[in-house]
Design a protein with these regions (language model features):
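Active-site histidine-anchored catalytic micro-motif
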Residues: 1-139
Length: 139
């Protein structure tokens, strides 16, 4: 079994979805591993990872709006408000989604459906640089 590690940095411009599918595919393609498992972790607690539709951008708009209603930016609702009105809502959204993704790799290809993409889901309203740690294992 072989292993490979890689970090992808994504600069966000505030709340929303940031597609990192192409960066991940490009990195996997350069590895000596043809078949295996890829684990991706986000090294933050106020953003998350999702596999979501990549064909219709309205899906991402609807998801963002849904989560903003589910965890509103209202400091009267929360005790943890250290970093502003989006602080605790960002942690709630992160807890309800994923901080890691696991994907099968077959013949150097990510096993994703036709309309699936890999997204960083930024929950904060300010710009951030997010780190996505990739760990590929296989043969």
């Amino acid at each position: 079994m072989q292993q490979a590690f890689h970090d992808i940095k994504i600069n966000t411009n505030g709340q929303g979805f940031y597609d990192f599918t192409k960066q991940t595919i490009s990195w996997v393609d350069k590895q000596k591993i043809n078949n295996g498992i890829l684990n991706i972790n986000i090294l933050h607690t106020s953003a998350s990872l999702v596999i979501q539709e990549n064909a219709d951008p309205e899906v991402l708009v609807d998801l963002k709006n849904f989560f903003n209603k589910l965890a509103p930016m209202d400091n009267r609702l929360y005790k943890h408000t250290t970093e502003g009105k989006d602080d605790m809502p960002a942690h709630i959204k992160s807890a309800l989604t994923n901080n890691q993704l696991t994907l099968s790799i077959k013949n150097k290809k990510l096993m994703l459906g036709t309309w699936q993409g890999l997204y960083l889901f930024e929950h904060r309203i300010e710009k951030h640089t997010r780190t996505l740690s990739h760990h590929l294992m296989g043969e």
